[in-house]
A protein has these predicted regions:
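Short, acidic/polar
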Residues: 28-42, 135, 139, 260-271, ...
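Carbohydrate-binding surfaces of carbohydrate-active enzymes
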Residues: 205-208, 252, 272, 283-286, ...
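Short, well-ordered coil/turn segments that N-cap beta-strands
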Residues: 15-17, 44-46, 78-84, 146-151, ...
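Aromatic-lined substrate-binding rim segments of carbohydrate-active enzymes
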Residues: 35-42, 49-114, 141, 242-249, ...
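N-terminal carbohydrate-binding accessory modules
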Residues: 1-49, 60, 75, 400
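The substrate-binding groove and active-site-proximal loops of carbohydrate-active enzymes
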Residues: 18-30, 53-68, 115-134, 159-163, ...
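Polysaccharide-binding and catalytic clefts of secreted carbohydrate-active enzymes
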Residues: 110-277, 281-302
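Conserved, mostly hydrophobic/aromatic
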Residues: 21, 40, 48, 77, ...
């Protein structure tokens, strides 16, 4: 494993701002290639990405390699000044491989093997598949080692996006080996998984089964946690096989992966440390359809800020350019001006390179209506013009943009694999830590406050406030880091339930939130309970159990009536999701108290001075109303202020900076013109360095990058 330091403040180290497209020369007649290269060069593109789904072309039968198609395509592009990023094609193994080795196919939770085709149909835990993956990677690396136009590599494609889990025999065998290596003795595994509950103990590692849910009832949370740890380990190992080969063949190549669904990947482990930087594929209008936040600009900012928390700045290997679809879903079509605005938003949130998906749409297959820069009729319209404008701007501004990090005044604890998985193993209808954090992120986004995600092991010194959203798994060394941050003047906010489970996913045996956190916060949890979500009829909408899902009647339960209310400042509001009854130390200030039922007058939220700062504890989950009240109380004393005050609706503001410069990105994500007041003095780098003093006029989907004076 690399000793690379992972930090949200890292920048991408490349010799240019990479700008271009994923390109599929195998999808179009060769008579188009020269014209394609000419138009890419005219657009200002300097790189393409190729071959991630082309294993069947590169190796049409076992041991017989044919690189001719890609050699010719790379050569034509190179003559026009366009370099190539090659991809290991292991997301789509060829049919001859699965026909010869059907045991490498993934198996779902019902025991059904995946059919050949589509993508990610093979099991990355399979030793047989791993050997073939290494073989094709080595063959490609050796072939392209001396090609001057091949500058870097992408591993696989969106690992674990289609189907992260597998219940194959290969996965079972590898899982058993993983556990034997971790625990050494079966008695230690039984203790970690709570084998004395429901007769789940094992006599040997060979007896261990995969955690198929509802077989007939729920598996142990410890069992589930280790299974997903194994999946993350297996994914990182599969990628490491490839990275090791690429590094050995040509150390000067950069290597990255294009993240998609973010499932079963430990971003603070070997997976990210093996890479020069991460890539993240961003389809704002698609992700908004999944999340239904009602605003694709907010969704884009959220996803990119989460990604940046893994290891810092990134590149975008696939940026939505047009209408996107597969047979079962589709997206909105970006209006004229939106392609460039979305691309600039990616840069504003940390992209140090960007490729528009894709050069031209396919005329066949399961993505025929996933549009690209060029249309089906081979004509480049407004998307080509906008991509050209963006490429020209990034080439001109690369020395300003590269080397800057994204400012973050409010940090949200993120990028911790164990905590997201621990929630999934025992959710009891509660929002995940990330879902809870979305409320704070959206609040900051709407008000132009610099906000992002960062791990407590990272450098917190640039922050002013740090929020921990209900991380049930906690390490005492993190407590020491939070204490040091507060002592130096920072504000720490810790959500309910934090620190209540061990690394084995057991409930702790001390009074919550655990000895170290209790000392830091001055708080002890005496009792707790679930509450209905705001507006809900009960504690859950769907009950999962053996035999399927049970949907309760659409009528109020007792939990709908049994509300917990609290007062904070001069406001009174209803708590959502969860409550805790707290006792406190003498040096702790109560900043919110329960105001009804038996807990009336008892602390709900507290603050304890630590050095120059404070540590706040919340005995509930965030709601929109609580988020507003809490930030009004905490932000100003912490020194948290908007980058631009009084933002009109539809305007996004972010800042990239370093010791030499500050770049304020101001974007209008609405289709109507808007006036933004309160902009700090500087020069708009997208408008001929025009001087900006206080006021900025933006057309619909208009953007500015203001290099702030002083």
């Amino acid at each position: 494993m690399s000793d690379k330091t992972l930090s949200a403040w890292n920048t991408v180290k490349t010799d240019r701002f990479l700008v271009g497209v994923p390109h599929y020369p195998e999808h179009v007649d060769e008579s188009y290639w020269e014209r394609d290269a000419e138009r890419m060069a005219k657009a200002g593109f300097n790189v393409v990405r190729m071959a991630e789904f082309a294993w069947h072309i590169l190796e049409p039968k076992l041991g017989t390699y044919d690189f001719d198609l890609f050699d010719r395509a790379i050569s034509i592009l190179g003559r026009h000044g366009i370099d190539t990023i090659m991809c290991t094609p292991t997301a789509t193994p060829p049919r001859w491989l699965t026909a010869a080795h059907p045991e490498i196919l993934r198996v779902d939770g019902k025991g059904r093997p995946m059919s050949h085709g589509s993508r990610q149909h093979c099991d990355t835990a399979s030793p047989v598949f791993r050997e073939h993956s290494k073989r094709i990677t080595w063959a490609m690396a050796e072939h392209y080692r001396d090609n001057p136009f091949v500058v870097g590599w992408q591993t696989d494609n969106e690992l674990n996006t289609s189907m992260p889990e597998s219940f194959s025999q290969a996965t079972l065998s590898e899982f058993q080996a993983f556990l034997a290596d971790k625990y050494r003795e079966i008695s230690k595994l039984n203790a970690a998984w709570g084998g004395d509950f429901w007769a789940t103990a094992y006599d040997s590692f060979e007896q261990v089964v995969l955690p198929i849910e509802f077989g007939p009832t729920f598996p142990s949370p410890g069992h589930l946690q280790d299974y997903h740890r194994f999946l993350a380990f297996s994914t990182a190992r599969f990628q490491h096989d490839q990275v090791e080969i690429l590094r050995d063949v040509k150390p000067s190549w950069f290597v990255f992966h294009n993240l998609g669904g973010l499932r079963d990947i430990d971003f603070r482990g070997q997976f990210s440390k093996d890479l020069d930087f991460v890539g993240y594929d961003i389809y704002p209008m698609l992700y908004d359809e999944f999340m239904r936040l009602g605003n694709h600009a907010k969704v884009q900012a959220l996803h990119l800020d989460i990604c940046r928390g893994f290891s810092g700045n990134y590149i975008v290997p696939e940026q939505q350019s047009g209408f996107g679809s597969q047979p079962g879903f589709c997206t909105l079509t970006p209006e004229p001006g939106e392609l460039r605005r979305m691309a600039l938003s990616s840069v504003a949130h940390g992209a140090d390179g960007l490729m528009f998906f894709r050069w031209r749409p396919a005329h066949f297959g399961a993505e025929i209506y996933w549009m690209g820069i060029i249309d089906h009729d081979d004509i480049g319209r407004h998307r080509y013009e906008e991509a050209t404008r963006f490429a020209t701007e990034m080439t001109a501004l690369k020395d300003k943009i590269l080397g800057t990090y994204v400012r973050m005044d409010v940090g949200i604890a993120g990028s911790d694999f164990d905590n997201q998985e621990a929630h999934k193993t025992y959710p009891i209808g509660l929002p995940s830590p990330q879902d809870d954090a979305i409320l704070l992120h959206q609040y900051c986004y709407d008000r132009g406050i610099a906000c992002g995600f960062i791990h407590p092991e990272d450098d917190l010194s640039k922050l002013k406030l740090f929020y921990v959203p209900h991380w049930v798994m906690w390490k005492d060394e993190w407590t020491a880091r939070l204490e040091a941050f507060a002592a130096s003047g920072g504000t720490v906010v810790i959500g309910a339930r934090t620190g209540t489970r061990t690394q084995d996913n057991h409930v702790i045996r001390e009074t919550a939130p655990g000895t170290a956190l209790s000392r830091l916060t001055g708080v002890r949890v005496e009792d707790f309970g679930r509450l209905a979500a705001p507006g809900a009829n009960g504690l859950f909408d769907v009950m999962e159990r053996s035999g399927g899902l049970v949907i309760p009647p659409n009528k109020p339960a007792e939990s709908h009536r049994r509300q917990r209310r609290f007062k904070i400042g001069n406001r009174e509001m209803t708590a959502g999701h969860f409550y805790e009854n707290l006792t406190i130390d003498p040096d702790v200030e109560v900043i919110a108290a329960w105001s009804n039922r038996y807990a009336e007058g008892q602390p709900m939220a507290t603050s304890r001075k630590v050095g120059k700062g404070q540590v706040v504890y919340l005995g509930t989950y965030l709601t929109p109303e609580l988020t507003e009240a809490l930030t009004e109380r905490l932000f100003a004393p912490a020194g948290v202020e908007p980058l631009v005050g009084g933002l009109p609706e539809g305007v996004e503001v972010t800042m990239r900076m370093n010791d030499e410069r500050r770049l304020l990105f101001v974007q209008n994500y609405m289709d109507q013109a808007v006036t933004v007041d309160g902009v700090p003095a500087g020069r708009d780098l997208l408008d001929g360095e025009k001087m900006v003093v206080g006021r900025l006029e933006l057309e619909g989907y208009g953007c500015a990058i203001v290099e702030v004076e002083g």
